[in-house]
């Protein structure tokens, strides 16, 4: 119990310091809010335009797409808040910045994850929440306890899946000793799979994103389970499955991170 309290106090301290450092530049924060709102609203408007022209996307109407899109942007924002440090692991490996983690008598994964609480990620959450609430109204989703729990499971699972993929890509730097950044490529893949129904893709791609590279569990399957409760052939809500997938993927990526730390050679070696 004493150890848990210690780690919680350290996490709170790290978070407070990260927030204070971000608030030193308030105009930058305001700029991010405006830019991200414009970015996501324009993206959503593009979906509305396509639906108006063709009637649906992958069999999904405008109302369902609004709900799916909002859920995707929310999980993206949460992932950026908690896991943005994974984007820069290559530079940290090359510059020897992991030395400080090794010198502290604390869990390495804990230190890395709580070292940077990205307040700017909330600038993605704001427009995501707006679109999500709009989508909830459009699909007439009843916000009872069961649906709230399903939404929370979906967001937690989607956030963990995104963080797991980012951490896996970043951990490759321990072996490649390269600053190559796959963030843009992975982000594009996330957008294509989580913001649109995977029914727009061929069956082999749907199977790929469901079983081998389970990005469809970020939003598509849990959202479909909420909008079409009878679609699942398993007795467990799809949102709960999404959370389980996220936990398994994140645990696996943490294991790869630990393996990579054994290969870490500091700077100049």
List the model feature ranges, each with a label.
Residues 1-269:
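Hydrophobic transmembrane alpha-helices and immediately adjacent juxtamembrane helices
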């Amino acid at each position: 119990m004493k150890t848990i309290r210690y780690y919680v106090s350290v996490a709170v301290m790290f978070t407070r310091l990260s927030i204070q450092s971000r608030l030193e530049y308030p105009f930058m924060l305001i700029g991010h809010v405006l830019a991200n709102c414009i970015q996501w609203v324009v993206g959503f408007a593009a979906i509305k335009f396509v639906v108006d022209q063709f009637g649906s996307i992958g069999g999904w109407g405008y109302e369902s797409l609004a709900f799916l899109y909002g859920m995707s942007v929310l999980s993206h924002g949460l992932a950026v808040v908690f896991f943005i440090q994974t984007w820069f692991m290559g530079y940290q490996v090359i510059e020897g910045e992991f030395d400080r983690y090794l010198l502290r008598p604390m869990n390495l994964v804990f230190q890395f994850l709580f070292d940077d609480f990205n307040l700017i990620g909330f600038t993605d959450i704001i427009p995501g929440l707006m679109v999500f609430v709009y989508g909830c109204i459009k699909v007439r989703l009843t916000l009872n306890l069961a649906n709230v729990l399903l939404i929370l499971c979906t967001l937690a699972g989607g956030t963990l899946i995104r963080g797991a993929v980012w951490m896996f890509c970043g951990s490759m730097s321990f072996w490649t000793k390269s600053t190559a950044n796959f963030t843009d490529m992975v982000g594009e893949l996330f957008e294509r799979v989580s913001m649109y129904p995977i029914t727009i893709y061929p069956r082999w791609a749907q199977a790929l994103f469901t079983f081998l590279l389970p990005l469809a569990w970020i939003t598509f399957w849990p959202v479909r389970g909420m909008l079409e409760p009878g679609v699942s052939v398993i007795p467990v809500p799809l949102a709960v499955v999404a959370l389980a997938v996220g936990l398994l993927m994140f645990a696996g990526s943490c294991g790869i991170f630990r393996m990579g730390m054994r290969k870490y050679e500091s700077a100049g070696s």
